[in-house]
Amino acid sequence: MNFGKAAIFGVVLFCLLWTEGAQAGLTFLSPADMQKIAERQSQNKLRHGNMNRRGVEDDLAGEEIGVTFPLDMKMTQEQFQKQRAAVQDFLYSSLLSLGSVQDTEDKNENPQSQ
């Protein structure tokens, strides 16, 4: 029984060490072979005319586009007061809708208390 536990432990340990070894060595090619593969891949990219993302990002990062335009609005004092009241009513009603239903009903029943 003791031998069986040791055997199982040994097999598990061997499997764990084997997977770490496989993860550590990505490829068994020599550096010269890896350079050949890299050259082939770069030639394929150039042949198809694809531009890598870094090259595109560098080109766009240098450009800065800015457009300015005036936002002038002319209105009378009366028009301004109407617009101001409309915006205040809109904001007040939207804020009330966020409140509880009972608070909203109380405000609607007694408009003079505001």
Swiss-Prot record:
Keywords assigned by UniProt, alphabetized: Cleavage on pair of basic residues, Hormone, Lipoprotein, Secreted, Signal
Annotated lipid attachment (O-decanoyl threonine): 27
Reported modifications of this chain: O-octanoylated by GOAT/MBOAT4. O-octanoylation or O-decanoylation is essential for activity. The O-decanoylated form ghrelin-27-C10 differs in the length of the carbon backbone of the carboxylic acid bound to Thr-27. 33% of frog ghrelin is O-decanoylated.
Molecular function GO terms recorded: hormone activity
Signal sequence, renumbered to the chain: 1-24
Entry keyword annotation includes Lipoprotein: yes
Residues cleaved off as propeptide: 55-114
Lipid addition sites, O-octanoyl threonine: 27
Domain of life: Eukaryota
Tissue-specificity statement: High levels in stomach. Moderate levels in small intestine, pancreas and testis. Low levels in heart, lung and gall bladder.
Main function: Ligand for growth hormone secretagogue receptor type 1 (GHSR). Induces the release of growth hormone from the pituitary. Has an appetite-stimulating effect, induces adiposity and stimulates gastric acid secretion. Involved in growth regulation.
Family statement drawn from the similarity comment of this UniProt entry: Belongs to the motilin family.
UniProt protein name: Ghrelin
